[in-house]
Amino acid sequence: MVARLTTLLVCLVFSLATLVQRGYGDFDDFNLEDALKETSSVKQSHFSTTTRRTGTTRAPANPAERWDHMTTTTTKRPGTTRAPSNPLELDGFDLEDALDDRNDLDGPKKPSTGEGGGLSDKDLEDILGGGGYKPDKNKGGGGGYGSQDDPGSGAVTDPGTIAGLVSALAAALLGAVSGYLSYQHRKFCFSVQRGLDAAYVKGENLEAVVCEEPRVEAAMCEAPPVTDSTQHSQPTEPLAPERPRI
């Protein structure tokens, strides 16, 4: 039983070593005799004669070299050479070109003949040089300011402005008319209410007069009581009727 387990263990170790060798390559310190040495002591107890293989010399194992398979290499980016920049050469830009008439796009300018025109390089030189600026005579036709340049001088008006003014006036007129109508309506309502109140008060007064007239007539028909001393001396006089109360 022990021999079978030992044989099975040897087979497993051998297969594992084969897989490791395929995955990582051959190692200098790997040898199958290591597995045979572990089982030699067990085999001596079952077999009378054992044959041992001659030992082979091995190089000392370095465990650090087993896993040192990945090597990294870094490459530097080659430097690029650039042309030296000259700050003075910016597309040939120079402020002196503004004073030179020969490098203009429309060609050299013709000298002014005194018939219209605007400012020229000569005028700028006179201003910068300290000399008084004296505009040329008869130059009112070219660069002068006319009434046609003023957008507000014409008689044409924006139609949006006219529409806004008309709408504002219409709204104001409509508001005034509606306010006047509401005032007249309220005034008429108050006058009608006053007439109704006056008629109501007058009707109440008439009812009071009608109710009081029978009492006055009854008082006039009744005679005052006569005492014994004045029964034969003074005749009885009817009482004056009372005025109706309003």
From Swiss-Prot:
O-glycosylated. Residues 43-156, 223-246 are annotated as: Disordered. The keyword rRNA-binding does not apply. Residues 49-58, 71-81 have a biased composition (Low complexity). The keyword Membrane applies. Residues 1-25 form the signal peptide. Residues 227-236 have a biased composition (Polar residues). Residues 182-246 are cytoplasmic. Belongs to the CD99 family. This is CD99 antigen-like protein 2. The lineage of its organism: Eukaryota, Metazoa, Chordata, Craniata, Vertebrata.
